[in-house]
Amino acid sequence: MTIRLNKVTRDLNVGIATVVEFLQKKGYTVEANPNTKISEEQYAVLVKEFSTDKNLRLESERFIQERQNKERNKASVSIEGFEKQQEKPKSEDVIKTVVPEDARPKFKPVGKIDLDKFSGRRTDKVEKAPEKKVEPVVEQPVVEQPVAEKTVVEKPVVESEVKKEEPKVEKVEVIAPKPAPVEQPVVAPKPAVETKPVEVEKVVVEEVKKEEPKVVETAPVKAEERKVERTAEVTATVTTPTEENASKENEVFKIRQPELGAKINVIGQIDLAALNQSTRPKKKSKEEKRREREEKEKVRQDQKKLMKEAIIKEIRKEDSKQAKPGVKDNNADAARKKRNRINKEKVDVNNVATSNFAAPRPNTQTGKGGGNHPRPQGQGQGQGNNNNNNKKNNNKDRFKKPVIKQEVSEEDVAKQVKETLARLTTKGKNKTSKYRKEKREMASNRMQELEDQEMAESKVLKLTEFVTANELATMMDVSVNQVIATCMSIGMMVSINQRLDAETINLVAEEFGFKTEYVSAEVAQAIVEEEDAPEDLQPRAPIVTVMGHVDHGKTSLLDYIRKANVIAGEAGGITQHIGAYNVQLEDGRRITFLDTPGHEAFTAMRARGAKVTDIAIIIVAADDNVMPQTKEAINHAMAAGVPIVFAINKVDKPTANPDKIKEELAAMNYLVEEWGGKYQSQDISAKKGMGVEDLMEKVLLEAEMLDLKANPNRNATGSIIESSLDKGRGYVATVLVSNGTLKVGDIVLAGTSYGRVKAMFNERNQRVKEAGPAEPALILGLNGAPAAGDTFHVVESDQEAREITNKREQLAREQGLRTQKILTLDELGRRIALGNFQELNIIVKGDVDGSVEALSDSLIKLSTEQIQVNVIHKGVGAISESDVSLAAASDAIIVGFQVRPSGAAAKMAEQEGVDIRKYSVIYDAIEEVKAAMEGMLAPELKEQITATIEIREVFNITKVGLVAGAVVKTGKVKRSDKARLIRDGIVIFTGNINALKRFKDDVKEVGTNFECGISLVNCNDMKVGDMIETFEEIEVKQTL
């Protein structure tokens, strides 16, 4: 039989190195490995050498076990414990160190006990010398009560070790009611124990048996019970070493043998039957102990309460005495008392207010260390005189604390502080000090006013009318989404770059707790609006805006009405510009149509169209549903207070279902006239012209109801529909005249641009001399591209126009500075936390202002938490050299929408490495920028498990390390994979595969159910049964 070295070291309580060294000395070669196996012969040699270490370990374990049992079972021991103590030493293991320690203190004589008290019959035997030896044994437990606990602990231990003793224990427990059986359990162990003291014990117990029947009724004192029990315990513990004399340490125990014998004789002379065990108090349960604790706590609380009431009464008495001073105290004594009282108050206040300062307290001593350290009385340096009062006075001092708390109020503190300050400032009361004080007060007041003013101004927004939603959000330091949500809650659909009017700005700002102040008021007042006399007003043509979802047939309808093909000229077959057309019907009446884009990017254009229009035609395709842009167009029209006419298009298609559209409109609370509502609707086919004339009739009917009038004989005012930069003609603006007549040669002021009208064209590009109310026109001669949606006015002189535009430019610059987003510390922290934060700077150039606005709006919307899109510049016209240099300086890309770079700009871009992207369709521009943003995102690493391998055998190969012989359970393991070692479901190691072999050949991969040899880089902990999981890391492209 072989035994592992690990087990041997545990059994013999020695280290592996010690065992290996010893065996080598004896001529055995053994590896210093815990799993090394040794023969029985080697084991016998080790046992012979290290048996003492083994015994020591067993002893210590036994001692620890006894101590733990002692703590668990704290019960008193009667004779049963005494008997068990005798029998317990049967175990061969001798407690060498512990027994002498227990025995020594127990023989120290402390006092004497008169044993004659127990019974008269035993006096004959007890009168001899043994009495003296009993005294120390009996008295000692009284001093060291834990002895009783020790004996109790040994009771369960003996039960577990010696099974034969269990019946004896049961009989011994019945000692009090039936004492007769006590003799049997004591007699039984006698043959097993050879020592003489045990025989003496037997005699003693026999005597007890004889005496018991006569003295059962007597009830001696409890103290005597305890003494007798404890003597029994002591003798039991002392006899233990006598039974273990077979061990090597006989010498130690021989000295004590005669003493032990004498003590045993003495115990035999005590009448144990006279002790009534039933009088011993029972061990209290946890519940009883808890009740006792609660009762004590209750008593303590009651005492505390009574003490508190007494203190309060005392305080009140003192207060009443102070409040009613005697009549006799009008002399100097009364004054002195009063002064003392005030001083006392001051001291109390200071104690409360400055309790943390270095004022000396009673029983504290200040030293080099600084601070007050409480010291016990009489233990200061030198231990000098203690100037402490007697206990009575100390109690008084202790009771004064609540007095302070009750007397001191905030008013008293304030009064005290005031008096102190007044006392401090009275020094040197001359004119200069008064003057300085007044000056300081004035300065502090001024500072306070400035602070208040700044606080008030921080909540006031200084802005020009028509700031965009994005700029407003920046000024209020809130998210633009919140501003848009607020606008939607009041029934307005706005986009990020849509300019808001004054009324909307006021509402939104008030919602966020800001006040508005329009700094352009003086500029607005510079242009005086003329009131028209009713007799000057003449009927004008209605302005009708066609709105709806993309591809629902808006432009097709206008093409039919105008007998033109606009769609063919639009890139991608979708409208990307707002168009204004004046159409004359067969009966001679005129209608001005505005065609708006349906794509979601053109929200601002639709809003602008709804703002300047009189009537809105909402087109819905009969073979489709009411789409999001349709709903948005309806909301824009409703917000502008414009009458709506629904045109249900494409009714000629086989899949058309006009009733379904009417049902969806009814669900949105727009009930058509056919269904008993107030909104007119017409089924049409824009391609074939079905129902178009009826639609015109209904539109003109709405116009008649509105009674539209204007004064053509005055200076023109109106709106900028679109503006662009034409290569041959310069800046061109499409305008819609709302009042007056615009003529060639008029000085037009629009936003920050102005100029003399050099030429005018209608929508068919035919030159015209003038444009009346509700007529669109294309004007040339402006010095810049005005923003779409701006109003234009005709002014008298060029100088007036220049002054107003200069002021507006200044305001625009100020507004730009105010709305410029500064990188805050919070934003910087957010970017650092993200780790891979990116910024994409874009310069947008387009052919018309509306398209530039729509495109930049859509690009800003693409911003995410990880990538922020910044449109650092946007403008109308071709891509110039200045755009390229700006892009090179700010690492931006240039997006051109239906514009091309000039030759010089293209060459410069090539040199500087600036990326210029040119688009004709807004969809393409948005999609490509989105793809570029996704490319900026760092790819995600994902793990894909390729195989699981089970280790069947582990080989330790020199210079290679551990190699596992394994079987591929699932999948296919590749040489390039990474691997993790798993043991009992826990990952032990993760790393790369060092080698993958099959029959001594290196292989690239091993399939399922094939065996292979595998080793991992720097892995030296493999065991049979471990699992190896192989995986590969795949880069996954992130999406927005």
Curated annotation (Swiss-Prot):
Biased composition (Basic and acidic residues): 81-92, 222-232, 285-335
Xref: SUPFAM superfamilies: Initiation factor IF2/eIF5b, domain 3, P-loop containing nucleoside triphosphate hydrolases, Translation proteins
Residues involved in GTP binding: 548-555, 595-599, 649-652
Region (G2), start-end ranges: 573-577
Region (G1): 548-555
Residues making up the signal peptide according to the UniProt record: none
Gene3D superfamilies per UniProt: P-loop containing nucleotide triphosphate hydrolases, Translation factors, Translation initiation factor IF- 2, domain 3
Ranges of Polar residues composition bias in the record: 351-366
Compositional bias (Low complexity): 233-244
Chain segments carrying region G4: 649-652
One cellular component term from this protein's GO annotations in UniProt: cytoplasm
Residue ranges, annotated region (G5): 685-687
Disordered: annotated span: 67-92, 214-251, 272-402, 427-451
HAMAP family in the cross-refs: IF_2_B
NCBIfam families recorded: IF-2 (TIGR00487), small_GTP (TIGR00231)
The protein's name in its UniProt record: Translation initiation factor IF-2
Organism, as annotated: Bacteroides thetaiotaomicron (strain ATCC 29148 / DSM 2079 / JCM 5827 / CCUG 10774 / NCTC 10582 / VPI-5482 / E50)
